[in-house]
Amino acid sequence: MKNNPLLIFIGCCLVPLILAYLALKLEWIPSASSNKGEFLKQEIKLQDWKKTEHKQWTIALNHPAQCQQACAQQLQALENLYIALGKNQGKVDVAILGQTQQKELPWRQLPEVDVLQPASLYLIDHMGLVVLQYPYHSEPQQNRLTQKGLLKDLKKLLNYSRSS
């Protein structure tokens, strides 16, 4: 009877540890993530990024020279995304990676990055690290869903990093 409280105490300490161990080993915990974009498989840091001042996040469109129709659609989507940011426009830059045929774009143009997919949108942090990819889909509805996902991810990131 004297050892009963001690056994209860030890049991209360050990049972959660055993359950946590079993949950990890038997994969009872789902491995879901809340981001809509795809993390890149390799780290890509843009060269010459530090030479100019950048805002917290940059939405970038990879626009190689051979990309025409898909990139033109994505340019229009990029403009709509920037408008949809609303009050957060001051915290986000927009950039084009490569050369466009439109000369009057209000966004920064940076050198093309060969390892990135053509016509895809990317989120780049203020240090020049490409963080998330949002691939281009030829089906307009799927493309709109991808762009909405980018907007959700960006708003989450801006909310998490409340500096400036």
Model segments located where?
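Short active-site neighborhood of thiol/selenol oxidoreductases, capturing the structured segment around
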Residues: 53-68, 78
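Thiol-/selenol-based redox modules, centered on thioredoxin-like
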Residues: 131, 135-164
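A short beta-strand-turn-helix
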Residues: 42-57
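Hydrophobic membrane-insertion alpha-helices, especially the h-region
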Residues: 2-27
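Short acidic, S/G/P-rich loop/turn micro-motifs used as interaction or catalytic elements
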Residues: 64-70, 102, 138-139
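A short, hydrophobic beta-strand/beta-hairpin element that forms part of a small beta-sheet core
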Residues: 78, 119-137
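Alpha-helical transmembrane signal-anchor/signal-peptide segments
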Residues: 27-46
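Structured, soluble extracytoplasmic/luminal domains of envelope-associated proteins
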Residues: 75-120
